Amino acid sequence: MRQERIKDRVLKRAARAWGFSDTEMETSFDPVVAMMLNALSYELEKVAHELEDSKTRVVERVLEIMFPEVTVGAKPARAIMHASPIDNNMKVSLQNQMTVTRRIHNIYNPLAPISKEIALSPTLEVKLSSAEVKYIAYERNLYEVSNLFYKDAVYDYKHSLPSGEVFLGIELKNANVSELEDLMLYIDIKNNHQKEMFHYYLKQMKCFQDNMPITVQEGYNVPVKHLDIENIINRKYTHLDEVMQEVNDYYFDNFYTLKGVLKSKPIKEYSSEYKYFENVTNNNDNPLIWIKMVFPESLIPQILDNVSFTANCFPVINKKRHTINKTLGDFLSYVALETDNSIYLDMDSVIDGFNNHYEIKEFQDSVIEEGNAVLRTGGVSRFDSRSASELLQNVLDLLKDESSSFAGLGKDFMNSSLVEINQLLASVEQQAKENSFLKSNAPYLMIKPKLNESIGKSFIINYWSTCAEEGNDLKAGTILESKDDLYFVSKESTLITNTVGGLNKQNNKDRILAYRTALLTRGRIVTFADIKAFSFNHFKTYIDDVKIEKGTRKEISVKAGFSRTVDIHIKTNQAEKESLSVTEWDYLCESFMKNLSSKSSNVFPYRLFIDS
């Protein structure tokens, strides 16, 4: 309630109590009374604002308790990367780092853009092969893959293949390699409208090498969901483990593994249907392994025109490793986890001078056992203090509000001092904005060394950070440099897809949506109301409305008729959606459908319709 309205109500109440009418109450009171009522209404307005602030703080605390950092923390961007191994059947490591320097527009000084290093790391230790897909043949077409994104037609090819058959010529990059084991292919289609149909046919694909059947396994060439005994014994599954599992599940449908061993042999030893590839095989510098993929005949070549087959690809996320070497004393030691203007993501390891791995625990009570490390972050860990940014913001607001009161004294010296103070405050405020001085508490470790062993020894502390939203929209084709620890791949790696999905820490509005979804659905999506709550929680401010209807569709299979569906119509918020790139919006929609299908118990398929 505004100060003028409060004063008006108090005046009316006072007039009735003292026997004055409404028409004469303005002129009947002494000016001192009016000044006192002014002061009273001003203080009451401040009390009202404090009550609103208290409500906000209570809601913030409740949300922090209900949704810890694992749920509402920052999410790294993810993408698909290609890297060529030096040796055959080498595994990538979760510790590997591929980096690129990105220039970010500086709104405060456009002539001095900000340079930020974006680091990407694998989410799965897949095996890479010393081979690449060199030729693709279907219908009347034979293409040579010139690089990862373009293919050139071979014009002297005159043969026509049966409908639904695709031949791949896989080039061996190493002269010492004569066979490939568990070759993994990344298969993607550029046209979103054909994606559902193509993936339906892709699941029915059969593979052969010279009439010998090849076992095709959907997914990666290493297990995704395996039981990690070390993780269970030594530490809890962390936020980073959940993120990597989510990324692996998201890209799972695009990877196919040819199980077993593919051996190289001369083209003349293949059956007669491969004789049309003799010219390109003999003219190629390196040996080729030819495989045949058989799809249903209803797969038209117009769909295959938009399909790419790529080897040596794997999912990556934006995470950067930090290492601290610190000598600790004989009692409890504190180590701040600095991230250089990035967002803290997760802990990796704490190792003492005797190579002992310390167990990393969440802060629960004041007792810390010897040989343990405790991670403390903001939120639930601190109830009785505000962060430095909150205190600074409070001081800025207070001095802005009260400076007008001092200026009313009319003294030139005080007025000039207040002008100078306001200028300094404006400079501090701009500096805080430029440095992204957010209301978040920097995490830190509390380490209690083992007695008589690790005292005075150097500890090695490894942890991860992410650029969150700043890591989004790195374009496909971006070349990344490999760090020194990436020995088994070439010095350069290439992005196959744009980076998408990076999110900063959720604000209170997003937390309320997540809280509402958790209360309504309890982790299960059954009713239309559950779908609606899940939709708002996923798309957040990018949509205004959601409508759920029952519908029908024609099945993709030529042998099936119509089937019932659940149609989800979302109305987008155009002003908010304009801030997203096309790839980011496509990722939002695709991840929404995948998460909805995995969490829902509905037997009917879902369809998503976008209403502008």
What is each model feature region?
Residues 1-612:
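Intrinsically disordered, low-complexity, polar/charged repeat-rich segments
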